[in-house]
Structure formats: C-alpha cells, structure tokens
Amino acid sequence: MEKKWTYCAVYSIIQMHLVRGIVEETFGAEEHIYALPGSDVNLTCQTQKKGILVQMQWSKVTDKVDLLAVYHPQHGFYCDSKSACRSLVAFREPPGNVFEWTLYLRNVSSSTTGKYECSFTLYPEGIQTKIYSLKIQTNVAQEEWKNNHTIEIEINGTLEIPCFQNTSLEISSVLTFAWLVEDNGTQKTLTAGGHPISNSALFKDRVRIGTDYRLYLSPVQIHDDGWKFSCHVVVRPGRVLRSSTTVKVFAKPEIPMIVENNSMDVIGERIFTCSLRNVFPTANLTWFIQRSFPQGEREEMYTTSEKRKNKDGFWELKSVLTSAYDNKPAHSNNLTIWCMALSPAPGHKVWNSSSEKITFFLGSLNPPIDSPLNATESTLGTRPSLANSISPTGYRTPSSTAHVDVSTSTSNVILPSVQTSNSDVPTRGFNYSWTSSGKDAKHSAPWMPSETNSSPSSGAGSTLPGDIFTSTTRASSEVPTTANVSTKNNHITGTVISKPKDGMSWPVIVAALLLSCFVLFGLGVRKWCQYQKEIMQRPPPFKPPPPPIKYTCIQESIGSDLPCHELETL
C-alpha cells in the first residue's frame, strides 16, 4: 500500500510539471478592436515558426468556448458554420518565418461583439493564444472620427505621427488612447495605454510612443508603404475620435548605368542598355542622343524596357535602345548617348540623376575619351517645364524608357537640367515641353506620348524635335540630317569602340577565321578516312608454311627398347 502511494505521488508531480510547461508556453495580451456597424473586420494573429505546427483554431469566448474554425496541416480546414471555410478564415506563411491565421467578420453588428481567441498548437513549444476584444462603436458622430492625413518619408528615416494634427486636444488621464494599423481591410492594435502590445514581426522593436501619444516608427522600411495608422481616443462611452495617417515611402535610386553590348554587325547596329536599381515607388528612364550625320544617312531606332521587383521590395528598371544605320558612314561622324532617371521624392520634389556619356566617332580609328561627370553639376542646360504635373499622391506606373533626339536639321534644342539634387517641381508624369527654332520640324522623328498605346501623330511635319515615345512601342524613323548641332557638354568618361581601317567589323573577321579552321579540319578528316580505306582494301601479306619438325632419339642400353630408326618411323 505504501509503494502504491509513492507511485501516485511521483506521477502527480510529473503531471504538474507537464501542465506547468504548457501554461508557460501559453501567452496572449488582449487587444481591443473598434469597428462601425455594418463594416468588415479582419482579425489576424501571428506566431514564429518554432517547432512543428500541430493545428490552429479560432474560437469565440462566451460562457464557454465556441469553436469557429480549425486548420490542420494534413487534414485541412474545418468550420462549425454553414458558410465555406475559405470565406471565414485564411492561413498564410508570409515572409519573416511566421505563421499567419486570419478570421474574416463581415457586416458586423452588436451580436458580433465579444472576445475572439486565436490559438496555435506547436510541438514541442505548446499552446500559444491571442485574444481580441471586438467592440462596435455606436452613436459616433461622422465629423469626429473622419480625419485623414498623408505623410511622405524617405526609407530608413524616422516616422513621427501625432495623434491629432491641427487639433487643440488637451491630453488628459481620463482619455483612453490606442494606436491601430490597417492594411487591405485588416486592422491590428499596435499600442494601448501607451505601451506596445502587438506581436507582429513587421513592427517588432520599431514602434515607440512619445509623451504626448505620438507614434514613432524607426527605421522606415519599404513594406511600410500604404499602411494606415489610426489614433483612437475614447472621450466618453460612445464618443470616439479617430485620426488616420497614410504613409508614403520613397527610396532614392542609384545613378543609372549605361553600357553598350559588344555585338555590332555589318549593318552598323548598336545596342545600349540603361539600368536603374533601388527604385521605389516609380521612376522614368529617358534616352538622350546627340549626333551629327552627313546628308543622306538613314537610321532606325527603337527601345524596349522591362522591370522586376527584387527580394527587398525595390524595383529594378532596364531599358534597351537599338540603333541601326542603313549606310556605312563615309566620313567621321560622332554619336553621344546617355540616359537620365527621374524619380519622385518626398515633398512634391524630383530626384534627377544622369548616367555617364558614351561617345562614338564612326569611321575614326582613335576617338577621344571624355573626362568623368560631376554628379552634382548641371549638364544639360535649362530645366524643362512641368506645369501640368500633379502631386505624388497618385503616381502613374513608370513609363520606364523614353527617347529624346537631340539632333535636328537647324533647330536649337533646350535640354533639361540633370542634377542629382532635389528640384522643386511636381513629380507626376515627367513629361517635358521641348522648344525649337529655325526651320520646320518635318525632319524630326515621329513620336508617341509616354505611357499610352496611341499611334503617332499624322504626318512627319506635325512633330517636334525632342519628342518622347513609349519605350515598349517600336518606332522606326528615317531621319536625314544636314547640319551639326553645337551643344555644350560636360566631358564624361565613356566606352569608345573603334572600327578597323578597312571598315570590316571584328565579328566578320572572327567568323572568317572560324570558317577557315573548320574547312581545314574537314579536309584533314577526309584525308585520314581515305588512308584508312586504302589500308583495309590491300590483300593480306604472304606467310610461308613452317618447316618440318625432325625428332631425335637417344638410345639407352637398358631394356629391350625399339631401335632409333624404328622410333623415327613412328
């Protein structure tokens, strides 16, 4: 009997430790969610990927725990309702090594008010829970909770949002403050009572509350763009003030890089690539060409563009310009090409940056090389007019590439200033007005408006020198030019490619050498095969028969053996 009680005591101690371990792994700070009647609310909880996920569930806490939905990695979803589980809950694994479990509440009312429990069961971590308290706001005056603002900030900066802007609201201990964040209809509580309570991995160690309930977010990241932060102040029961602030994030791109693909063929085709990295939210790439050709020279020019988003959320733009000359230049002709990037900046400004220039002297053997460009120096003259642009609150998608022809018959083209510093001009569109004087612009290239698919203007005489066309649209032009353009250029180090004296390009020479080697190799193989065939057709050499074998006998005196002559006959 004594041994039985001992075993029971040891078993009870082990069970107490197991239960204690599970309770220690269970966590959850209650968050208050405020919603208006008839609105949609999304409740989202997250947890770190530690151990093995057993299951997760949503429950409503009343006198008892009412199961709403369960998710199991192997068995899928189960919902205790007539509606489909896909319209009630959602499970995701977003970046950041976390699990995300969302409950959708549609058309909320007073019956929806209550506490909702989100729980994760992990092995061997245990059970982790999070409780949300949903409260329906009633008798809220419309003019009290609608107060929206927008803040623009550069990446890696410190975001400071006052609870109420341009409002003489006296801070009192009687008032209840709470900061919430909203994205795509999902609303989460960041702080309550002046203390951060959100366990979201996106805002971990980045949120701080000031003495006057200002929200500080540092450092600002790319994925903060579009977040709406709301400050809720409960003045008295049924009276809630709300001020919402939307964040717009900007990133200054790198200086564009321009290179030439070493693939010029016999018809004089040149391919240039302009690349721009770390772009957010958008940018425009514009090609500039300064050239001087004798009369009768013709060319075809078109651009293509592409963009992609890297793993950090930045955009990378690339524009490819192809220029093909029909005739071989009879004289020494120069070609200078570069690209410019325009991207929006906070405060309705624009970041301007220009690539280095590449200068070619077609038909010349030893072209000069220019000196490098100072990035803060104006290189193109007077800034263009941007009177029709608007603020960066509604940016267009980037047109990515445009083409500007600087060479005309006798026109004087005023080019935009290319500086890396900010300029006090609106940022949407980046369309320019180019002015020219002299003869009619009938010799200029046809154009297409940026970011549209409309056809070029009718007639070559209706276009202006320096027009911009969409990079993704092929626009071929035959432009005879009769005069050189004198333009002030800052010298920039460029890549210079010269042609041989005889005018033959190096790909043709390499192809001829390879063809000669191939012919010689084929002749050698053919000669070897003929030699092998002759060897196989020769008759086999004559081989004489072997000589006869003679046997010798050694006679012994013992026994009656046969004499030697008899053995020889055998």
UniProtKB/Swiss-Prot annotation:
**Hey, which stretches end up on the Cytoplasmic side?**
526-570
Which UniProt keywords are listed? Cell adhesion, Disulfide bond, Glycoprotein, Immunoglobulin domain, Membrane, Repeat, Signal, Transmembrane, Transmembrane helix
Q: Which residues lie on this side of the membrane: Extracellular?
A: 22-504
Between which residues do disulfide bridges form? 45-118, 163-231, 274-339
Q: Where is the Ig-like C2-type domain?
A: 253-359
| Transmembrane portions of the chain | 505-525
Q: Which GO terms describe its biological process?
A: cell-matrix adhesion; inflammatory response
> What SMART domains does UniProt report for this protein, alphabetically?
IG
The positions making up the signal sequence are: 1-21
| InterPro entries xrefs | CD96, Ig-like_dom, Ig-like_dom_sf, Ig-like_fold, Ig_sub
**Polar residues: which segments have biased composition?**
450-461, 469-486
Q: What cellular component terms from Gene Ontology apply here? A: membrane
Question: Glycosylation positions?
Answer: 42, 107, 148, 156, 166, 184, 261, 284, 334, 352, 374, 431, 484
Q: How does it sit in the membrane?
A: Single-pass type I membrane protein
Record's subcellular location: Membrane
Q: Where does the record place the Ig-like V-type domain?
A: 38-125, 156-222
Sequence segments annotated as region (Disordered): 373-403, 441-486
Record has Ion transport as a keyword: no
Domain of life of the organism in this record?
Eukaryota
Function field? May be involved in adhesive interactions of activated T and NK cells during the late phase of the immune response. Promotes NK cell-target adhesion by interacting with PVR present on target cells. May function at a time after T and NK cells have penetrated the endothelium using integrins and selectins, when they are actively engaging diseased cells and moving within areas of inflammation.
Q: How does it assemble?
A: Homodimer; disulfide-linked. Interacts with PVR.
Q: What is the protein named?
A: T-cell surface protein tactile
Tell me the organism: Bos taurus (Bovine)
Its gene is CD96
